[in-house]
Each structure stands twice: as C-alpha cells, then as structure tokens.
C-alpha cells in the first residue's frame, strides 16, 4: 500500500485541528468533506469538498472509487444521520473507520439541568407560562419554537435562520464561537433570560453559556446525544492520531 488516503467528514473545530495535524505530518492524502450548511466556513488546511454524498450507499461508492483506506467521522455530535451513513459506508466499502467525538458536558454543583431527548421535548418542558428563552441549538432547530409561541426567544446561529420561524417575540444573534463567560453572562442578563435550550455538544467553544447559567441560576433544558454508533470512538485529536498510527505504521505511511 502507498500513502494512506483518508476522508474526514468535518464541520467541527476538532476536524479542522485534525486536518491541520495530518497536513503537518505530510504522510497521507487527506480530503476534508463539509456538508455545506454554513455560508462562510472557516479556512481549512487540506483540500476540501463541499456538499452531501446522496446517502450511505453513495458515500460507500465514493470511498471505493477514491481508493480510501480510512474514514474519520468528525462531524457534530448531533449529526446523527451523517454518522449513521458513515458507519454503514465504512462497513460496506471494507475500510477502517474512526469517530472523533468530544466528551459530553457533565453536570456540576450549581447546575440546574432538565434532561430531555429532543428539541421539541425541551420546548414542551418550558411549560405553558411565558418565559424568556435562549434557544442555543443553531438554526436547524429554531422552527420547533413555533410550537410554543407564548415565549420570548433569543435565537443564536452562525448563519441567519431562513425562513425565520413564525414568532411574534423573537430576537436573533448571528455569531460564531468560541464564546467567553463574560460575554455569555452579559447576553443572558441583557435579555433577561430565564431558560436555556442547549444540546450537550461538549467542548470548550460553547460551554461558556452553561457556566453563565450556573452563575445566574438559570434552568437549562439539556438535549441528550443519541446513542453512539458501533464505530471505534475517540475523544481527542491526539487519540485520533494515535489510532491512525496503529492502523498505518510509519513505513506504510511513507509509502515504503
């Protein structure tokens, strides 16, 4: 085997860091695939393809046609469909697969979390009385707020929510993390937020809102992750690199 060919399914900070580390090593051919949902994606250190594959079978065909040896699923922890497609495609094409998943946030003393399984369940858990809600789940889940229009919603996303949800009492924040504790604290105070809906994405980039909620005594409707797939899972870029070294010894990666 020559240089290993690696396809990274990205869209996260971890994917970018992993791609940068592999590019610095220079001992494999790496392609980073982005779904294309973000209008202005961050610059990437390796060649990039943008857009979906058309399903699990089409992804398997792409892997086989491209002669890939490894598929790395470094998508968002809540990109369940993409992760399921990745697991199927790796098995169908007979190549190795690794899932890079940052650890979940853990409840700490002072946290007021209400565990839910979905964004609709979080909306329902707000109750019937009007509340002031920070909906911090991104633009794709924003339309669920239409089920409970009695609340005020502060909706934050990287790109504008299109079409906007049919809500009478809503404000929007267009911003990209990482966010600071000071900034999140001020945001929650300024909008008089008394409830947050958040996905348990893990990582440091968006954790500040959870810290600020703890300090302010704000309830958090925490959406749980779906069960992990059967793909080998690691939690850090370093662990991913170690797994790659195990799969492809140095002589193989040099093309020797």
What residue ranges belong to the model's regions?
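Histidine/lysine/aspartate-rich catalytic loop segments that bind and position anionic ligands
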Residues: 146-177
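N-terminal beta-loop-helix "entrance" segment that forms/cooperates
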Residues: 31-54, 111, 165-170
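Glycine/small-residue-rich loop that forms an oxyanion/phosphate-binding "nest" at active or ligand-binding sites
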Residues: 59-120
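Internal active-site segments that recognize and position negatively charged phosphoryl groups
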Residues: 120-154
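Glycine-rich, highly charged phosphate/nucleotide-binding loops
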Residues: 46-63, 174-183
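N-terminal basic/disordered segments at the start of proteins
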Residues: 6-36
């Amino acid at each position: 085997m020559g240089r290993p060919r690696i396809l990274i399914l990205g869209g996260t900070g971890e994917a970018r860091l992993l791609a940068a580390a592999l590019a610095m090593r220079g001992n494999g051919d790496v392609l980073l695939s982005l779904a294309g949902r973000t209008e202005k994606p961050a610059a990437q250190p390796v060649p990039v393809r943008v857009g979906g594959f058309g399903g699990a079978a089409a992804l398997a065909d792409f892997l086989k046609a491209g002669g890939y040896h490894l598929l790395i699923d470094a998508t968002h922890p809540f990109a369940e469909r993409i992760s399921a497609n990745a697991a199927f495609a790796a098995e169908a094409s007979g190549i190795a697969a690794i899932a890079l998943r940052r650890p979940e946030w853990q409840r700490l003393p002072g946290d007021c979390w209400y565990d839910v399984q979905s964004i609709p369940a979080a909306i329902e858990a707000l109750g019937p009385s009007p509340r002031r809600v920070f909906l911090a789940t991104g633009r794709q889940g924003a339309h669920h707020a239409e089920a409970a229009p009695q609340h005020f919603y502060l909706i934050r996303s990287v790109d504008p929510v299109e079409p906007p949800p049919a809500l009478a009492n809503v404000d929007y924040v267009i911003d990209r993390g990482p966010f600071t504790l000071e900034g999140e604290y001020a945001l929650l105070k300024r909008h008089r937020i008394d409830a947050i809906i958040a996905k348990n994405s893990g990582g440091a980039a968006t954790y500040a809102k959870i810290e600020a909620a703890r300090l302010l005594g704000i309830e958090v409707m925490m959406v749980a992750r779906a069960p992990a797939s059967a793909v080998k899972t690691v939690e850090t870029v370093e662990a991913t690199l170690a797994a790659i070294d195990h799969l492809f010894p140095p002589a193989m990666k040099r093309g020797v």
